[in-house]
């Protein structure tokens, strides 16, 4: 009798486990979608001005708001100042998923 009870509990736990994993993967995908403002336009505005090395500044901002795999590819960015202390970063050779 104990064996049957243990078997049933194990079956119930294993049936709940995969559904819990799929919900976790789904929420992780939503977080990644929120962190990816760069695609498809590959342009992003920020509330600051371009520094002396604006291209590096844009790349640092890209890395902080994008997937860490960006570091594995060669990305070059262009920084352009806009009125009211805004800057536009354009990274045209960035690979979008």
UniProtKB/Swiss-Prot annotation:
Residues 1-24 form the signal peptide. Keywords: Antimicrobial, Disulfide bond, Fungicide, Plant defense, Secreted, Signal. One of its GO terms (cellular component) is extracellular region. Disulfide bonds join 39-96, 50-79, 58-89, 77-91. It is found in: Secreted. One of its GO terms (biological process) is defense response to fungus. Belongs to the DEFL family. This is Defensin-like protein 246. It comes from Arabidopsis thaliana (Mouse-ear cress). The lineage of its organism: Eukaryota, Viridiplantae, Streptophyta, Embryophyta, Tracheophyta.
């Amino acid at each position: 009798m104990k064996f049957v009870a243990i078997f049933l509990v194990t079956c119930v736990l294993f049936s709940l486990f995969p559904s819990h994993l799929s919900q976790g993967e789904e929420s992780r995908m939503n977080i990644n979608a929120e962190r990816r403002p760069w695609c498809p336009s590959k342009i992003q505005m920020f509330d600051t001005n371009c520094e002396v090395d604006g291209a590096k500044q844009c790349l640092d901002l890209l890395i902080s708001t994008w997937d860490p795999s960006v570091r594995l590819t060669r990305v070059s960015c262009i920084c352009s100042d806009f009125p009211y202390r805004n800057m536009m970063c354009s990274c045209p050779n960035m690979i979008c998923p």
